[in-house]
Amino acid sequence: HFQNYSSTKEGPLYSISLWGKRIPKGVNRGFILSTTKNGVSFFLQNIPKIQGNTTNRIGSFSTSXGXKKTFAYPHETXNTMLFPLLILLLFTLFIGXXXISFDNGGADNGIGGLTILSKWLTPSINFTQESSNSSINSYEFFTNAIYSVSLAIFGLFIAYIFYGSSYSFFQNLDLQNSFYKESPFSYFFDKIKKNIYSWSYNRGYIDIFYTR
């Protein structure tokens, strides 16, 4: 499945950004986040320009009408993956609070032999305990949740920097360009960002696990 971005304008004055949309050549490529009249484009300085016949580099596909159209990048899955992920999200949110208690599990009820995942399924907050113990468990629960949630939010923030949508309301804040200043360390940090992006794009972390 590919998202349709038909190349109606052929020529060297246009290049394809990370999101597959055509961006005019006259964009300031010194910034990681470059602002154009139509929106924001990410990491344009490393995007190769596609000149002339784009059929050899991307591929040409025929539609039912018989007209050839060029597609720039694969389209993300729609509701086929969205609904299963939402179902998994519900289990992820509530399994820690509701969970399944194995305190009474033993030879009497036959649950004792099925406790492989008992530690994962044991509720973090036991509502049957006294109020003092419940408050302590609640404090531990939220303390442990802060670290994991903070790490997840930090990962989302990094992903937004690299892959954030150009139609987001954050584009008016001009965050990255406001932090970017000409300094002796700007080139060094920009080089690090490019290496991290290239490493993650080429799935270097997967190669490390497979080579072990």
From Swiss-Prot:
It is found in: Plastid, Chloroplast thylakoid membrane. Its EC number is 7.1.1.-. NDH is composed of at least 16 different subunits, 5 of which are encoded in the nucleus. The gene is ndhF. It is an enzyme of class 7 (translocase). Belongs to the complex I subunit 5 family. The keyword Ribosomal protein does not apply. The chain crosses the membrane at residues 82-102, 145-165. It holds the Pfam family Proton_antipo_C. Its main location: plastid. Keywords: Chloroplast, Membrane, NAD, NADP, Plastid, Plastoquinone, Quinone, Thylakoid, Translocase, Transmembrane, Transmembrane helix, Transport. This is NAD(P)H-quinone oxidoreductase subunit 5, chloroplastic. NDH shuttles electrons from NAD(P)H:plastoquinone, via FMN and iron-sulfur (Fe-S) centers, to quinones in the photosynthetic chain and possibly in a chloroplast respiratory chain. The immediate electron acceptor for the enzyme in this species is believed to be plastoquinone. Couples the redox reaction to proton translocation, and thus conserves the redox energy in a proton gradient. It is a multi-pass membrane protein.
